[in-house]
Amino acid sequence: MFDTILIPTDGSDHAETAAETGIELATAHDATVHVACVADTGPLGDLRLPGDATSAEDAMRGRAQEHVDALVDRVEAAGLDVTGTVLEGPPESELLEYAQEIGADVIVMGTRGRGGVHRMAMGSVTDHVIRFGEIPVLVANSGSNP
């Protein structure tokens, strides 16, 4: 039923809960897993961090790659085929486009991510993916309070 599973991550506790659910689902279906993290670089351009020659965009890409690498290691440890990628741009549209590109059968994501402003029940990225995507979304609730 599920041959290709997309697990977006941002390293948050909610994403970690979703990752565990996604790994369990992939194991049950012997599915291929795609791990993605979106570096939402937005209008930062070549903004430099104080005392650092690294641009804010480069720092975001680096953090995104760390999140991807950590989850790829966990998926590999579960004995599953996995591909990891860092996407750039608005997370909502990038995740939907990538899911279509890889032919995902399901997207497994958390109720919310690292965003500074929390919505009452669900994060804006998750909400957007559910509302505007054509691919089924499994939302894993971490059970923690906002």
What is the predicted function of each stretch?
Residues 1-17, 132-146:
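Intrinsically disordered or low-complexity boundary/linker segments at protein termini
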Residues 3-48:
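Small/aliphatic-rich secondary-structure junction motif
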Residues 21, 59-71, 94:
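Short, solvent-exposed amphipathic alpha-helices that sit
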Residues 36, 83-87, 138:
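General small-molecule cofactor/ligand-binding pocket signal
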Residues 39-66:
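Acidic, proline/glycine-rich short linear motifs
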Residues 73-107, 132, 144-146:
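Structural beta-alpha unit
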Residues 101-146:
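Gly/Ser-rich helix-loop-strand patches that form or flank binding pockets
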